[in-house]
Swiss-Prot record:
Annotated source species: Hydrogenovibrio crunogenus (strain DSM 25203 / XCL-2)
Family: Belongs to the pyridoxamine 5'-phosphate oxidase family.
Physiological role: Catalyzes the oxidation of either pyridoxine 5'-phosphate (PNP) or pyridoxamine 5'-phosphate (PMP) into pyridoxal 5'-phosphate (PLP).
Cofactor note as given: Binds 1 FMN per subunit.
Name listed for the protein in its UniProt record: Pyridoxine/pyridoxamine 5'-phosphate oxidase 2
Gene: pdxH2
Length: 213
């Protein structure tokens, strides 16, 4: 079967991105765009694609949720026994990608991932809904399971076990911070003349440049 998508295209007609109107600090620029994405009521504006590479140089992507960001980096949480965690242990160089289609915007981040402190992971875990806390215990992420029903059954057992009192913190779960080395802001443009403003960290200083689309 062949599916021809040659005529499937979209014009980008929103305002362009002028480097003179972008902040010299990429984190400030990201915060500005992120708040605009929130105000636009996009579905999970904090959803980002995380790209990793395994021990045989096979790349993988998956969507995770940004839970914190600051001038230090971008934080997400996961099971430390998952495939993504194994990939990061092998090669901590990763990429993040935010795709805000309704705003005709993308943000691409290249950096290095490292585990955050146990204290910070525990603090965030305590804020999660009880069902999500139980889910962290039940799901042996990336492992083969016989059925969805088995997972639901295990969830109910854990729910009964922890029906009273706090749910303990799983030591195989926690956060990663991606410390960026390059951050690119992309704004769609008419006739495919897109705007690309790229910040690269050089000698502990952010260098801002315009890239050809």
């Amino acid at each position: 079967m062949t599916l021809n998508l040659a005529d499937l295209r979209q014009r980008y007609l929103k305002d362009g991105l002028d480097e003179n109107n972008t902040d010299d600090n990429p984190f400030v620029q990201f915060e500005k765009w992120f708040h605009q994405a929130q105000k636009s009521e996009l579905l999970e504006p904090n959803a980002m694609v995380l790209s990793t590479v395994n021990e045989v140089n096979q790349p993988s992507t998956r969507t995770v949720l940004l839970k914190q960001f600051s001038d230090d980096g971008f934080v997400f949480f996961t099971n430390y026994r998952s495939q993504k965690a194994k990939d990061i242990q092998h090669n901590p160089k990763v990429a993040l990608h935010f795709n805000w289609l309704e705003l005709e915007r993308q943000v691409k981040i290249q950096g290095v991932a490292a585990k955050i402190s146990l204290k910070d992971s525990m603090r965030y875990f305590a804020t999660r809904p009880k069902g999500s806390q139980i889910g962290a215990w039940v799901s042996h992420q990336s492992e083969v399971i016989s059925s969805k029903q088995l997972l639901l059954s295990q969830f109910e057992k854990m729910k009964q076990k922890f029906q009273s009192g706090e749910i303990p913190f799983p030591d195989f779960w926690g956060g990663y911070m991606v410390v960026p080395q390059q951050i690119e802001f992309w704004q769609g443009g008419d006739n495919r003349l897109h705007d690309r403003i790229c910040y690269t960290l050089k000698d502990n200083q952010w260098v801002k440049q315009r890239l050809a689309p």
